[in-house]
Amino acid sequence: EWVPDIWIEDVFAACKRAPQHTYLFLTKNPQRYLDMGHAGKLPMERNFWYGTTITGPETEYFGASCVNTFLSIEPLLEPFSADDCAGFRRLGEPLWVIIGAMTGPGSKRKQPKREWVAAITEVAQSAGVPVFMKNSLKDLWGGPLIQEYPEGMVRVDGE
């Protein structure tokens, strides 16, 4: 909230001048997206993706059918039940889910369980939502990481 709207609007304007790129905007304050949307200040460009960082099922997030939205569940600190995962649709289905573990000092004490990651992945994929597992899950997952991208999003390697 300490960031003035004009700063955010300036970033959006700069991004609009380079439409060949895909932009991921990530916040822990999803109310800001709602406020900007109600004020007519949230661009609805096809290459703009609005994400919310959440760490558990109780965290509020932004979802809207008129813009590209995603969830960044990182660090995953607690399990999501099937009901919690189905609740992703309460504000509009995210078009992408990113999952990651805590990294850095002290992170070994706060690692998610594999079944937590599997539950989120299963619900997302059954709804047709691509899942991207961050490299921080490599040891926990035990197999090749699922690293899917939304349809139409250009990957860094150009695919």
Task: Label the model's feature ranges.
Residues L137-E159:
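C-terminal accessory extensions appended to soluble enzyme cores
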Residues E1-F132:
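Conserved AdoMet/S-adenosylmethionine-binding subsite of the radical SAM
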